[in-house]
């Protein structure tokens, strides 16, 4: 059993774990970026900050805000 744990741990170190997350696109003061129903501004801003894509999340709890997928 100990060998299995050690081998699993070694594989994680060798392979490397790269994780991404989804989340709101925010300004430096941690305020969300509001958007109009057009997702182009969100997509450009999210990609500029390392995400794979961005969209305008309409009618959410905080209003129309930018949502990014795959943030690094």
From Swiss-Prot:
Source organism phylogeny: Eukaryota, Metazoa, Ecdysozoa, Arthropoda, Chelicerata
SS bond list: 35-56, 42-66, 46-68
Name of the protein in its database record: Probable neurotoxin pcD-1008
Organism for this UniProt entry: Androctonus australis
Family of this protein: Belongs to the long (3 C-C) scorpion toxin superfamily.
Top-level lineage group: Eukaryota
Keyword presence, Disulfide bond: yes
Signal peptide region: 1-19
GO terms (BP aspect): defense response
